[in-house]
């Protein structure tokens, strides 16, 4: 049953992302992007193996969206745990602890950004990925199903998580 809910959540997120992208329309190229580095923050959808495995097929035959974009520019993106610049971790929430699986050691997106900013800065040709919120929604729905929160409170928590993510994005620009 939880799998069906997760599948629906992923489909809604994918459709919303596609609609947002389609709304951008077309444009002309002023100057071609030539990125030096790819840096990522987020949850399972952006995780490239922070804890040893990814939230996809792990035989190397499938790349997630960050790996696909980096490869289009002849670059790679690897987890911080392996010396790279992808801070994203599966089950990470935006600011709340523990993560959606109950692991208090998983860095929140806020903590991921804190770690990067404590040891580095963005360059003019860096590409930054940030994707989060699914784990917050899953935790909220689990609380509703467990009877520990109301649907209205879950919606309010989701709105707050969205505002917290916007705050983190503003730190990056």
Briefly describe each language-model feature range.
Residues 2-5, 24-173:
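Conserved active-site regions of diverse hydrolases
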């Amino acid at each position: 049953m939880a799998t069906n809910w997760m599948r629906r959540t992923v489909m809604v997120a994918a459709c919303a992302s596609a609609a947002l992208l389609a709304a951008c329309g077309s444009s002309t190229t002023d100057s071609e992007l030539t990125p030096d580095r790819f840096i990522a923050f987020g949850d399972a959808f952006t995780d490239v193996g922070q804890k040893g495995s990814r939230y996809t097929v792990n035989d190397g035959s499938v790349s997630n969206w960050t790996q696909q974009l980096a490869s289009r520019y002849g670059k790679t993106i690897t987890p911080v745990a392996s010396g790279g610049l992808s801070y994203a971790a599966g089950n990470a929430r935006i600011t709340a602890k523990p993560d959606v699986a109950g692991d208090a050691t998983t860095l929140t997106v806020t903590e991921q950004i804190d770690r990067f900013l404590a040891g580095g800065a963005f360059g003019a040709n860096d590409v930054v990925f940030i994707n989060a919120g699914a784990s917050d929604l899953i935790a909220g729905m689990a609380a509703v199903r467990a009877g520990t929160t109301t649907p209205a409170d879950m919606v309010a928590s989701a709105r707050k998580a969205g505002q917290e993510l916007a705050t983190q994005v503003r730190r990056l620009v």
